[in-house]
Regions:
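C-terminal non-catalytic interaction/assembly regions of soluble proteins
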Residues: 174-265
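Extended, charge-rich low-complexity interaction segments
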Residues: 38-43, 91-103, 244-265
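Glycine-rich oxoanion-binding loops at beta->alpha junctions
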Residues: 2-29, 176
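Short Gly/Thr/Asp-enriched flexible loops that form oxyanion-binding sites at enzyme active sites
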Residues: 43-57, 76, 201-207
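Short, acidic/small-residue loops that bind anionic groups at enzyme active sites
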Residues: 5-10, 54-79, 215-220
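Mixed-charge interfacial surface used for oligomerization/domain docking
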Residues: 99-204
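Short alpha-helices
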Residues: 64-105, 109-118
Length: 265
């Protein structure tokens, strides 16, 4: 997967002087791919760090992840946000690097994953940002927020609480419509917890999403369920669908040994 990760403060972009040493450390002589979620601060800071790395002789390519169908523009982005699909980009691009692809090819694989993955999220509760000490938005016990982000951002609309199947349908419909999923498509289905939702409930969402895809004639060839890209203690989940081809499936299946993903070794 990744050779380096650069966290900023909670819900804050890392700075160029944090990104640069990570970039230099990750470079083995063939260059470095930055995988960046599409948030304005992240984009600007990674651009600056890439320029600094290039000045030190390290070639850098950037894959910008913007899989969130909930927004086109927000206070935090120009265009769609990068959310759950980032995990899939990281795994598959990392596998391409591991098999020996050059810098341009690894970046191209990452961009292909981003072009074929879409995500939508829901919150049943807000999260509390540590430096603020208060919930990021107010949500009644009988309400849910559709289209939330991963940094505690509110969603695009608020509706009364529904059962799990109803919520799943609301999340999945815009994802499938935007991807244009049709009969015969092969997909990876990723149900991601936002941090405070029991795993058993995530599998309830997965069951319904897989059923909807089957009804459309799509085949769920690969799946992932769990808490992988979270918003502290937020209760909720996101659904990501990635359209697969033979190469993307092969790269997803390639051995991986990390704290989060582990198979084939």
């Amino acid at each position: 997967m990744l050779d380096a990760a650069v966290p900023g403060a909670v819900f804050t972009s890392p700075t160029p002087d944090q990104i640069l040493p990570a970039t230099l450390a990750a470079n083995s002589g063939a260059g470095v791919v930055h995988i960046v979620k599409n948030y304005t601060g992240d984009v600007l800071n990674f651009e600056t760090a890439a320029e600094l790395a290039e000045a030190e002789g390290v070639s850098v390519r950037t894959v910008l992840v913007n899989d969130d169908v909930a927004v086109e523009d927000s206070l935090y982005t120009a265009g769609r946000r990068g959310v759950g699909g980032t995990v899939l980009v990281e795994k598959i691009a990392g596998a391409a690097a591991e098999r020996g692809d050059d810098l341009e090819a690894v970046a191209a694989v990452g961009e292909r994953v981003n072009a074929n993955v879409r995500t939508m999220g829901v919150a049943l509760s807000a999260c509390t940002v540590p430096h603020a000490g208060t919930p990021s938005f107010d949500l009644a016990e009988d309400e849910i927020e559709i289209g939330i982000g991963i940094h505690g951002e509110p969603g695009r609309h608020r509706i009364p609480m529904e059962n799990a199947d109803g919520i799943t349908d609301r999340l999945l419909e815009p994802v499938l419509a935007d991807l244009g999923i049709t009969s015969g498509d092969r997909v990876l289905l990723f149900v991601n917890g936002m941090g405070g939702t029991p795993l058993s409930e995530l599998y309830i969402v997965f069951r319904r999403a897989a059923q909807v895809l089957a009804d459309r004639g799509a085949t769920v060839e690969r799946s992932l369920v769990g808490n992988y890209i979270t918003a502290l203690e937020m209760q909720g989940c996101s659904i990501s669908v990635l359209r697969l081809d033979d190469e993307l499936t092969e790269l997803w299946d390639a051995p991986v040994h990390t704290a989060a993903l582990r198979w084939g070794v």
